[in-house]
């Protein structure tokens, strides 16, 4: 497999992508990493790292910046690292793309360059949350690709999320829910109530509404919401997880006695394990489900380790038959979902700034 890594995407680019790509190439000699970016900036960094032969550089002279309008910049910057990378996937010269750059531009690039899977109206970013029960995971989508959603979008997110969890995570019968402000069917908004009505007609194991706390319970494996809410939940959870660890450390340091210091030493392995559970770097990146190809959206602050793991997620998805399962399940869902718009206007509707 050949994997594209956007060398210019992210807060720590190009240093973090270059180092992450080198680490992955060394660990996976049977696969190739293609760093796409400004060769004049990438080459000096590679010279210090002595990269293996299965890592190559593909020059791209432009960058879609984090503060630019996503679709406008992607269309205008024809030689951007993100656009060139997606074109390599489209042309069959690579099997997947990973980027820690502008997530809106990744969404735009996936739609405009690769297109949607048949029947998909809006792709979605799917983010994994750690579960307290059984060491499992919960998949939340959309985690930021679509601010405004229709009920059919949420229903499709559920279909894609359920298929992904089965194919990628090996859960035989994932439990699916809609995120709301209470478990009662009378709660929620017109969007969540209508989406729930659609999902009750499906063959999914739909359990109704769940609250935010249930993302971590292990009782459900797929939770759907609009991209605005999902992104707020994702970033809040990230902050809470790291904040709890920080507050615990501060409490121990403030006490400062011998007992506290001994206790801190004994707790160190547990704290390190907890940090790994809540650290986004361990998950690498979130797949963009619903495009005709594999695209992984990595955190903007991704470290080399995070990008190493994101490349691992891309490889596993490309090798695991996930795309075929997504296509099959979306096709089956046409029996109970309303007709989706087709053609260029539908694609443009899914791409915004």
Swiss-Prot record:
Question: Looking at its record, which EC class is this enzyme?
Answer: transferase
**What is one term from the GO cellular component aspect held by the record?**
cytoplasm
Highest taxon above the source species: Bacteria
Q: Which residues form a coiled coil?
A: none
Q: SUPFAM superfamilies in the record, alphabetically? A: Isocitrate/Isopropylmalate dehydrogenase-like
Which reactions are catalysed by this chain? a fatty acyl-[ACP] + phosphate = an acyl phosphate + holo-[ACP]
Q: What is its EC number?
A: 2.3.1.274
Key word Cytoplasm present in the record?
yes
Subunit structure of this chain's protein: Homodimer. Probably interacts with PlsY.
Q: Which family does it belong to?
A: Belongs to the PlsX family.
State the function annotated in the UniProt record. Catalyzes the reversible formation of acyl-phosphate (acyl-PO(4)) from acyl-[acyl-carrier-protein] (acyl-ACP). This enzyme utilizes acyl-ACP as fatty acyl donor, but not acyl-CoA.
Name listed for the protein in its UniProt record: Phosphate acyltransferase
**The organism of origin for this protein:** Myxococcus xanthus (strain DK1622)
